[in-house]
């Protein structure tokens, strides 16, 4: 029983194995058959596609190109590859040649022959690029390349490339240098333009700051006037001081509308004077600031017996437009037009004339210096001081200087070719050219010792009037008092030692401290006045130490000194 059972199982397994072998053999046969058919089909298609361009000319060119790229990618033409490289070389060198030709034109080089060679070479490259053989071959339209034609084309392109390279190597250094020089010039020009603009803007800003009245100064003047109004009895005018006409004393003339500035000048003189009771100050201001000036010196009388006389321009009755040409000119329409209207002749059109826009040039206070002998007829000598100076030592030695019969004792400012008469006067005018030397050395207003007797003898005021009348149309000089001063006191000025008067503290940061320490008078000429926010800090303390900070109105007006 057991044997029969095993024999039955073995027969069934043998039948199943035979069926499986038959099935797998059939599948292998079918796979091999399909593989053979696929290879045969691919071979036929491949062979037919090789001959199709020569047999069927009715197919579109795009179809041919597509078939070529699809089935012949592995069979690229070596001539075609070389042609592409040659074409790229030609294009690159054409671009380079055109660039160097453009540089040559831009730099305006004298090598016109070289420029022409570059231009001719660029034309040759363009002609090569437009040749039918090269153009059609590069367009990839499937045309076969002839080796002879290709070699001729290749040689021609290589010759042009070689020529271009040689020319570029020869001229590269020169062109690069010239280009750098041109770029540097362009940069310098642009920077100079910016610098000029910045300087002019700075000059305008500085002028605006200089001509504007600071809030603190306005506050001080208003409070002083308010004090006068509140206490009229306290500030009645005192009788004239006999010292004002005593020729044996030391007399000073100060013409200003700036209360704090005048107080500093007077205080600096008194504090450094050996005998202050012998010093007399003649202060002249305008009608608007007269009350404020009087109240200041009433509230803060001078120490140690010094004297002060305060007047307004209007107190000198002889100063009217019929006598003083400058008053007549200041009222003229022409000068108003020159000063205020924005036309071609306006001073602001010329950066060198910006300074003439300062209101002081339209103030009679600025011209009073030419009438000193008539304003003080009983005096022999007088020291004229601007309101932007500080006196640092006793200056009575100025009265002892022998002026050799000259009218004006002043410090000369010329050095080299600077600050000569030619810079202040119009020497193209025949009258100026005939009467003055353009190389004559100029001097400075601000600290001048005047011999009034010599002035009267030389009739200097008449000379001033003569030239001022001639300059009504401003053809001899522009606005200002230094040019007419140079004319009036030409050959009548005694040069003083430079240590008496050191200038430039209002514009020149390079004035040495040694010069300043040794100076009798330091002068803040320029726009950076010490009472303004734009003052130079290194010099400001030399002025502020003479400000009367104990004065209550100075504290209330927040001078920030």
Curated annotation (Swiss-Prot):
GO molecular function terms listed in the Swiss-Prot or TrEMBL record: polygalacturonate 4-alpha-galacturonosyltransferase activity
Recorded topology in the membrane: Single-pass type II membrane protein
Residue ranges that the UniProt entry lists as topological domain Lumenal: 49-561
Gene: GAUT9
Stated family: Belongs to the glycosyltransferase 8 family.
Tissue expression pattern: Expressed in roots, inflorescences, siliques, leaves and stems.
Species name: Arabidopsis thaliana (Mouse-ear cress)
Xref: Gene3D superfamilies: Spore Coat Polysaccharide Biosynthesis Protein SpsA, Chain A
Cytoplasmic compartment spans: 1-27
Transmembrane regions listed in the UniProt entry: 28-48
GO terms under cellular component: endosome; Golgi apparatus; Golgi membrane; Golgi trans cisterna; trans-Golgi network
Record protein name field: Probable galacturonosyltransferase 9
Cellular location(s): Golgi apparatus membrane
Glycosylation-annotated residues: 124, 320, 346, 426
Main location, first listed in the record: Golgi
GO biological process: pectin biosynthetic process
Function (record text): May be involved in pectin synthesis.
SUPFAM superfamilies: Nucleotide-diphospho-sugar transferases
Domain of life: Eukaryota
Entry's EC annotation: 2.4.1.-
Pathway: Glycan metabolism; pectin biosynthesis
């Amino acid at each position: 029983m057991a044997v029969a059972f095993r024999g039955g199982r073995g027969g069934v397994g043998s039948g199943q194995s035979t069926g499986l072998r038959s099935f797998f053999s059939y599948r292998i046969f079918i796979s091999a058959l399909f593989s053979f058919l696929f290879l045969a089909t691919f071979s036929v298609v491949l062979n037919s596609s090789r001959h199709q361009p020569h047999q069927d000319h009715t197919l579109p060119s795009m179809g041919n190109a597509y078939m070529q790229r699809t089935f012949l990618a592995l069979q690229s033409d070596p001539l075609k590859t070389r042609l592409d490289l040659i074409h790229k070389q030609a294009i690159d060198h054409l671009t380079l040649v055109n660039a160097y030709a453009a540089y040559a034109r831009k730099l305006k080089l004298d090598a016109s022959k070289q420029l022409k060679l570059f231009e001719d070479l660029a034309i040759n490259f363009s002609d090569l690029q437009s040749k039918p053989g090269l153009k059609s071959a590069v367009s990839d339209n499937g045309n076969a390349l002839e080796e002879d034609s290709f070699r001729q084309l290749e040689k021609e392109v290589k010759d042009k490339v070689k020529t271009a390279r040689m020319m570029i190597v020869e001229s590269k250094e020169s062109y690069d240098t010239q280009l750098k020089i041109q770029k540097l010039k362009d940069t310098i020009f642009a920077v100079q333009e910016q610098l000029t603009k910045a300087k002019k803007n700075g000059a305008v800003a500085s002028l605006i700051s200089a001509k504007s009245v600071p809030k603190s100064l306005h506050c001080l003047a208003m409070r002083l006037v308010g004090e006068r109004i509140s206490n009229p009895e306290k500030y009645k005018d005192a009788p004239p001081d006999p010292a004002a006409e005593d020729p044996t004393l030391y007399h000073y003339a100060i013409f200003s509308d700036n209360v704090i500035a005048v107080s500093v000048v007077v205080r600096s003189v008194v504090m450094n004077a050996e005998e202050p009771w012998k010093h007399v100050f003649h202060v002249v201001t305008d009608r608007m600031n007269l009350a404020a000036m009087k109240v200041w010196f009433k509230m803060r009388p001078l120490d140690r017996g010094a004297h002060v006389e305060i007047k307004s321009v209007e107190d000198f009755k002889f100063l009217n437009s019929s006598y003083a040409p400058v008053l007549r000119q200041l009222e003229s329409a022409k000068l108003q037009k020159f000063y205020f209207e924005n036309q071609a002749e306006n001073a602001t059109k010329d950066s060198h004339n910006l300074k003439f826009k300062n209101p002081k040039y339209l103030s009679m206070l600025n011209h009073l210096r030419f009438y000193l002998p008539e304003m003080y007829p009983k005096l022999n000598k007088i020291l004229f001081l601007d309101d932007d100076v500080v006196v640092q030592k006793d200056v009575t030695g100025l009265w002892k200087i022998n002026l050799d019969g000259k009218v004006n004792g002043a410090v000369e400012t010329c050095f080299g070719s600077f600050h000569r008469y030619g810079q202040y006067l119009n020497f193209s005018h025949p009258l100026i050219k005939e009467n003055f030397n353009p190389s004559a050395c100029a001097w400075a207003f601000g600290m001048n010792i005047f011999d009034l007797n010599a002035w009267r003898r030389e009739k200097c005021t008449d000379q001033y009037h003569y030239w001022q009348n001639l300059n009504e149309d401003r053809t001899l000089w522009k606005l200002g008092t230094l040019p007419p001063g140079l004319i009036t006191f030409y050959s009548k000025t005694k040069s003083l030692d430079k240590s008496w008067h050191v200038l430039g503290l209002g514009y020149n940061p390079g004035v040495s401290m040694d010069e300043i320490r040794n100076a009798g008078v330091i002068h803040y000429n320029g726009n950076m006045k010490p009472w303004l926010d734009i003052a130079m800090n290194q010099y400001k303390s030399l002025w502020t130490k003479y400000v009367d900070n104990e004065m209550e109105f100075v504290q209330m007006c927040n001078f920030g000194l």
